[in-house]
Every structure is written in C-alpha cells, then in structure tokens.
Amino acid sequence: MARVKRGVTSHAKHKKVLKAAKGYYGRRKNTIRIAKQAVEKGLQYAYRDRKNKKRTFRALWIQRLNAAVREHGLTYSRFINALAQSGIEVDRKALSELAIHEPAAFAAVVAKAKSALPKAA
C-alpha cells in the first residue's frame, strides 16, 4: 500500500488560515503559527461581539427614545410604562425609527400613551 504524506492537506490548511488572515498587520498575515493564533482570536471576538451587538443596539434605541420623549415632557421609563398601560405593543427599534423619520407620528404615539397615564393630583 502506498505511503500517504500529508503535504497536500497541510498546504490547504495553511492556505485557508492565510486567506483568513488577509489584511492583518506584520507577521500575523504571513507566518502560519502567528496567523493561526490571530485568526482564532478574531473569531472569538466575532462570536462575542455578535452577542454584544444586540445589547449595543438596544441601548442606542433607548437613548434615542429617551431624547425624543423628553421633548414631549416625559421620561423614558414613564413613557414605556404609559405604552404598556395604553396597550401599544411597538418595540423600541420601531419607536426610535419612528421618532427619527416620522416625528409627527411619534408625537401621536406619545400623546396616546400620555392619555393612559393617571393624572397627577
């Protein structure tokens, strides 16, 4: 039986790693051992930040909503409470987009939510 040498497979693996390390700085782009470590670390960052992206965007929407709602004399927390009481089920992403691109429609939503709040004595 013929002897199997692993030159072809190892070359393919190296090529795959170097392709993934394209654009890296210094020896990270052309030295196999260092490139492999850099690519693995990059994949770890990518995995972690795919999770963090959801948190980051939610925080952004909340900041935008807080700023937009304060123009109408409410705070973010009171606005969200008012939305729940009035039965309006629109997510924060849609509300922030509405506040940016359709201020009149957002003002109507705020007015509807305000009407659900109990009057302060």
UniProtKB/Swiss-Prot annotation:
Query: Is Glycoprotein included in the keywords of this UniProt record?
Result: no
Signal peptide range in chain numbering: none
Q: Which residues cross the membrane?
A: none
The family database entries (InterPro entries) matched by this protein are listed as: Ribosomal_bL20, RIBOSOMAL_L20_CS, Ribosomal_protein_bL20_C
Which is a Gene Ontology cellular component entry for this protein? ribonucleoprotein complex
Q: Name one process (GO BP) from the record.
A: ribosomal large subunit assembly
Q: Report the GO molecular function annotations.
A: rRNA binding; structural constituent of ribosome
Record-linked Gene3D superfamilies:
6.10.160.10, Ribosomal protein L20
Alphabetically sorted, this entry's keywords are: Ribonucleoprotein, Ribosomal protein, RNA-binding, rRNA-binding
- Establish whether keyword Isomerase is in the entry: no
Q: What family does the Swiss-Prot or TrEMBL record give for this protein?
A: Belongs to the bacterial ribosomal protein bL20 family.
What is the role of the protein in this entry?
Answer: Binds directly to 23S ribosomal RNA and is necessary for the in vitro assembly process of the 50S ribosomal subunit. It is not involved in the protein synthesizing functions of that subunit.
- UniProt cross-references to NCBIfam families, sorted A to Z: rplT_bact (TIGR01032)
This protein is called Large ribosomal subunit protein bL20
Q: Which organism is it from?
A: Methylorubrum extorquens (strain CM4 / NCIMB 13688)
